[in-house]
Amino acid sequence: MSLSIRVNEKAFGKGSFKTSVLQDVNLTVENGEFLTVIGPSGCGKSTLLKIAAGLDGDYEGRISMNGREIKGPGIQQGFIFQEHRLFPWMTVEQNIAADLSLKEPAVRKKVDELIETVRLKGAEKQYPRELSGGMSQRVAIARALLREPEILLLDEPFGALDAFTRKHLQDVLTDIWREKKMTMILVTHDIDESVYLANRIAILTAKPGRIHKLIPVDLPFPRSRTSPVFQTIRQKVLKEFETTETFSFQEGSGI
């Protein structure tokens, strides 16, 4: 699976009210790659992810998967939002199955497997009000994986969680990626998270967002945040990120 992203321009508004959010973004994500996307606030990270998922078609450019143009959402793309968006009247297993019937043996088997994968064994019958934030996001991850998408797109899914839970779910996500060998693209504000998870990091400039730098992360798994190599890559990413932040400040200040 190769995902080709070309966004000549994405803008909101018309005429004198037009605001360009993304410009001249060209990116290819290879099969099995874990790409993280970082950049200043408002640079269009989440918008780019929604375009890649087929959730936003109002842009100039082309998104294709294995040469086939993506014109809307499909089962080949799984999407996880910043909020878990679980149905409050459904149990964990019902939320994972969503519109599919748990009475179907194949669905039942798949849901049970995913409950094991995201480490929710024993919580199958619980409702969202009984779950912690981390558990709720694990349900959302399992639901996104149910139809076995070719690519999983994640829009800051751990942003609202405490540090301990966040690190735990990063490990869960890494295990899923390594086991299923699927392609993942994750948007984040967290540089440590970006280095911990990714094969490659895309850094966007300030609005309008463009690709500022692509940085490979050549680290074996499992990774240690305290290792010298990890810290070296982190400092490299931070330096490039600060460059985009400085540019954003200068643009806004008229310097």
Curated annotation (Swiss-Prot):
Q: What is the official name of this protein in its record?
A: Aliphatic sulfonates import ATP-binding protein SsuB
Q: What does this protein do?
A: Part of the ABC transporter complex SsuABC involved in aliphatic sulfonates import. Responsible for energy coupling to the transport system.
Q: What is its EC number?
A: 7.6.2.14
Q: Which organism is it from?
A: Bacillus licheniformis (strain ATCC 14580 / DSM 13 / JCM 2505 / CCUG 7422 / NBRC 12200 / NCIMB 9375 / NCTC 10341 / NRRL NRS-1264 / Gibson 46)
Record-annotated ABC transporter domain positions: 5-231
Q: What is the lineage of its organism?
A: Bacteria, Bacillati, Bacillota, Bacilli, Bacillales
What Gene3D superfamilies does the record tag this protein with? P-loop containing nucleotide triphosphate hydrolases (3.40.50.300)
Q: Where in the cell is it found?
A: Cell membrane
Which top EC class applies here?
A: translocase
